[in-house]
Amino acid sequence: MFKLKRVYDEPSSEDGFRVLVDRLWPRGVSKERAGLDLWLKDVAPSPELRKWFNHDPARWKEFQKRYTAELKGKEGAVHVLREKAKSGNVTLVYAAHDEEHNGALVVKRFLEHHTK
């Protein structure tokens, strides 16, 4: 099962395998506090797409489309997440303040629709 959690929220045992899916390290968070098992930069949106989106909700629909297309080309990184999910929860950790418009949500939906 795939879950989402902000990096600023406390890790918990229910999180299972915790993966940071952002390209940039979150501000003000130590590696210890983040409690991550993996930082998977390769699954993050391209720098160009991230800059274009700029957390603008008006660009959300188009961002989802473009990012989903990018994820289809990142099979190696996506495979890591699929494999981890076979043995328990995988929590996709992200830094964005907007919980409804962020890259981790796109990754989660992609994994749920493209994992058997």
Give the location of each predicted region.
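Residues lining hydrophobic/aromatic ligand-binding pockets adjacent to catalytic sites
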Residues: M1-K116
